């Protein structure tokens, strides 16, 4: 009888403590400009986060602006569960939970496996999905994937913004974003980006130019049409770094002027005209 009585008291105490904990829990507020506060767009149709069987990290436009991210690799460095590698000096190479990939990149749910470094000037949101998902994205997605959501024209709004930055090595970047109404049911958005690349290595340099023009019109209450043209023009020196044997034998030496390759020949160029609808 005493054991039964003690069991009832313990159960009552657990219930009352859980109720007290529930009352003290503060409501979680999602801050930042998230396109879908509880949805992921990497699956081409919006999917609630609760229905995604992987771990998801969403990086918003506000966070990109606040932290000064210039390219996709900057986001990866500050996202748990993924990290970036050298990529042979000419492409994004991400490690998803120990699985390295140069192809698991998507833009608005469509595959983007071109070998280059991806800028963020026309990106509204980045979704990092960690965990195997070969059923939807193929066998390459055994570790995870990254989806970028592009900025779209906003009907009924007009705004312009200019952002610029520079670093101590002499590199700079500038971005222009303008949204204009064309009519009551359509809008156009112009985004322009230019930057230069510099670091502590003497022969590392490059420049990138991006232009993206987007048009949106409302066909009816349930349908919209988006048209996009993007110009990509990238050129950079392929710097593969210094062999570890040199740093092992000469740990106190500087190798800023040592380069393995020809600065005038070892260049990576990306030129593309991209149309989408």
Regions found by a protein language model. Give the residues of each.
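Acidic/polar loop-and-plug regions of large Gram-negative outer-membrane beta-barrel proteins
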Residues: 195-199, 212-218, 222-276
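Acidic, small-polar-rich N-terminal luminal/periplasmic segments of exported/outer-membrane proteins
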Residues: 26-157
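Short strand-loop junctions, especially beta-strand C-caps/beta-turns
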Residues: 62, 110, 165, 195-197, ...
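Repetitive helical segments and hydrophobic/amphipathic motifs
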Residues: 11-12
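Soluble non-cytosolic domains of exported or imported proteins
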Residues: 58, 66-70, 169, 206, ...
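Bacterial N-terminal signal peptides that target proteins for export
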Residues: 1-8
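Outer-membrane beta-barrel translocator/receptor signature
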Residues: 122-124, 135-211, 219-223, 273-275
